[in-house]
Swiss-Prot record:
Gene: rpmE
HAMAP family: Ribosomal_bL31_1
An annotated GO BP: translation
Organism of derivation: Onion yellows phytoplasma (strain OY-M)
Region described as Disordered: spans on this chain: 72-93
GO molecular-function terms, A-Z: rRNA binding; structural constituent of ribosome
Higher taxonomy: Bacteria, Bacillati, Mycoplasmatota, Mollicutes, Acholeplasmatales
Pfam families: Ribosomal_L31
Name of the protein described by the UniProt record: Large ribosomal subunit protein bL31
Bias (Basic and acidic residues) ranges: 81-93
Annotated Gene Ontology cellular component terms: ribonucleoprotein complex; ribosome
Cited function: Binds the 23S rRNA.
């Protein structure tokens, strides 16, 4: 059998970018960096974390300076007026 053909197997610390915890594993790679580990991943912790990203609507509103006050009123105020007119129509019959 040939000598020195297998890669060197070492114990390496896997470092998590989110929580900073390091987990020792055996591998042939010299270093491993991961985004989330079992210590901080929402599936294992049960906690929900949301990454807030600006979507296309937010980008549009920011570009044209539209604020929450300037947005269109909802239909609910219009529905109240419609209910009153329906009641008035019934009374007038």
């Amino acid at each position: 059998m040939k000598a020195n053909i297998h890669p060197q197997f070492e114990t390496v610390e896997v470092s998590c970018a989110t929580c900073g915890k390091q987990h020792p594993i055996g591998t042939t790679v010299t270093s491993i960096k991961i985004e989330t580990c079992s210590n901080c991943h929402p599936f294992y912790t049960g906690a929900q974390t949301f990454v807030v990203k600006a979507g296309p609507v937010d980008k549009f509103n920011k570009r044209y300076g539209i604020t929450q006050d300037q947005k269109v009123k909802t239909v609910s105020s219009n529905a109240d007026n419609q209910k009153e007119t329906t009641e008035e129509l019934i009374k007038n019959k």
